[in-house]
Amino acid sequence: MAEFETVRRAGAGIRTAQIDEGLRAHMNRVYGLMSLGMLITGVIAYIVGMDFAAARAGEPTSFLSPEILQTMFSSPVRYFVIFAPLLVVFGFGAAVNRLSENAARGVFFLFSALMGLSISWIFAVYTGASIAQTFFVTAIAFLGLSLWGYTTKKDISGWGTFLIMGVIGLIVASIVNIFLASSALMFAISAIGVLVFAGLTAYDTQNIKNTYIAMASHGQTEWLGKAAIMGALSLYLYFLNIFQFLLMFMGNQE
């Protein structure tokens, strides 16, 4: 009996070690996909934004003609540029169960490219130095928040409801401010937005970790590939929102 218990504990220890090793690989994959998505977004936003700024100044463009830029930003096509990433995200969420892992990865990269188009205007409005500074601050804050969410022993699953309510409140306030055009309200939205998405970063990092442990413990490995993509998408969105809200405080306009 004692020998059986020893074998059982040894087997459990091996299983735990395997899960821990798999968890590290899973989180590395999540962060890797997120980073690649951010790189795609950044490159496209920079290329399009710099050409847009050049076209506005009457200078030669490098990649896109002034006519194409005019169509993208000054015609009804601009609504596609603005809302296409949202449509892709909602469609992805609805169809992810039917997609293969490769298809899901392709949709994520498509979303990243479309988001690059959607936010390219920042390179035409803000100085490159202030954009780089804001990105650096965002990256440090994000890493700290995500690391805390991963390592903390505190169960923060209860934050979810309040954070989602915060996101809904931000959306409503932003819609209202379209009509009010209040700088004070925009300041408040940006400040609260940083806090809400900071909380979501820690919350969802812990959720990604716990989801992996639950799936791996029950042998549901076939879903883990797509779970990594969904986790990367969530963290990508939180990073981008923190960056954009901080840019309202730290960005210097051209």
Locations of the language-model features?
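A hydrophobic alpha-helical transmembrane-helix feature that marks the membrane cores
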Residues: 1-254
